[in-house]
Amino acid sequence: MKDKFLVTGGAQLQGAVKVYGAKNSVLKLMAAALLAEGTTTLTNCPEILDVPLMRDVLVGLGCDVTIDGSTVTITTPAELSSNADFPAVTQFRASVCVLGPLTARCGRAVVSLPGGDAIGSRPLDMHQSGLEKLGATTRISHGAVVAEAEKLVGANITLDFPSVGATENILTASVMAEGRTVLDNAAREPEIVDLCRMLRSMGANIEGEGSPTITIEGVEKLTPTQHEVIGDRIVAGTWAYAAAMTRGDITVGGIAPRYLHLPLEKLKIAGAKVETYENGFRVQMDKQPEATDYQTLPFPGFPTDLQPMAIGINAVSNGTSVITENVFESRFRFVDEMLRLGADANVDGHHVVIRGIEQLSSTSVWSSDIRAGAGLVLAALCADGVTEVHDVFHIDRGYPNFVENLQKLGATIERVSS
């Protein structure tokens, strides 16, 4: 039976919530543990569905993995399987991040083409071309990407687009390559910086992370490490928008506000009061938000993962706004569900024009991906009556204790079997 949420609108969310490790970091860090024989420990891990899925992938490759609350322990053997071509791999997008480590450790990798959120085309072209620049041959065969290399050699690589996934796979493939790799137009996301911090603690020689150019000097061997996962800026941003949309007052801990600089600035423009601290922030809103234009871009631009929240707040704002999606072409399918809730919006290519209204109307809606699901719950909190949110398994993949946290903040929400 698939679960659904019953969400009653009208509550002004108030209180404090702490975010744990980033989904977009922990899965890549787990994969990076493949690079070193021995036991690597990750702390501050989020208790979300994708972590046990990645455990299953690593176990299938020969690792021993234990999950104890927010701590994940990975013991990597001397001899790994290079074949990640089994069902667990197809269930979520991040599984492709084993491609780089397996190619580096085994000289060969077979990785099933991954699944995950239905938010547009996310081809592996840049992953493959990056590995090929390092000396590997790659091909797509029978639903899997295959990489083979007698040895990897450092190279100058320029990405067509600052892809997070391609940056990660090139990093993990090049840390033990012979010589120097210079990666230009690299992704600058905080999760990339977190991966580089972990790799450096394992003995990698990396400079420039957080900038468009990352330089890697290959080393012969990496060693296991202990590492604390960076806080989840997307979950933190979701709580920030929850405060503003419900005209509430929420304090968020466990996240450096600099990672959410632009979203918090956008909330200020919409009329929210924002206070920032060393490891958290507070968002207060006591009136209808003002319409605010957005465009999604790679970090440090506005994150595409918060685009549903930008649509949500503008749906209940004063005025007309334009949201431009520059990263994933299919992310506007979320708008169809917002229309069910009574939003006044229309899609034109990679833009959506929203005319704000005072209140949305309760109905039944369906999640299509992790962030759309969370965005629909926030929108339901701004509707009259009770809204049914279906396919909430998507939300479980990215938001730990979502219902419990909302209830603690004053929302009326329950999980039931549909």
From Swiss-Prot:
UDP-N-acetyl-alpha-D-glucosamine binds at R93, D305, V327. It is found in: Cytoplasm. Its EC number is 2.5.1.7. InterPro entries: Enolpyruvate_Tfrase_dom, Enolpyruvate_Tfrase_sf, MurA_subfamily, RNA3'P_cycl/enolpyr_Trfase_a/b, UDP_GlcNAc_COvinyl_MurA. It catalyses: phosphoenolpyruvate + UDP-N-acetyl-alpha-D-glucosamine = UDP-N-acetyl-3-O-(1-carboxyvinyl)-alpha-D-glucosamine + phosphate. SUPFAM superfamilies: EPT/RTPC-like. It is an enzyme of class 2 (transferase). The keyword Calcium does not apply. Pathway: Cell wall biogenesis; peptidoglycan biosynthesis. GO terms for cellular component: cytoplasm. GO terms for molecular function: UDP-N-acetylglucosamine 1-carboxyvinyltransferase activity. The keyword Transferase applies. Phosphoenolpyruvate binds at K23, N24. The active site is at D117. It holds the Pfam family EPSP_synthase. One of its GO terms (biological process) is UDP-N-acetylgalactosamine biosynthetic process. Keywords: Cell cycle, Cell division, Cell shape, Cell wall biogenesis/degradation, Cytoplasm, Peptidoglycan synthesis, Transferase. Cell wall formation. Adds enolpyruvyl to UDP-N-acetylglucosamine. Belongs to the EPSP synthase family. MurA subfamily. This is UDP-N-acetylglucosamine 1-carboxyvinyltransferase. It comes from Corynebacterium glutamicum (strain ATCC 13032 / DSM 20300 / JCM 1318 / BCRC 11384 / CCUG 27702 / LMG 3730 / NBRC 12168 / NCIMB 10025 / NRRL B-2784 / 534).
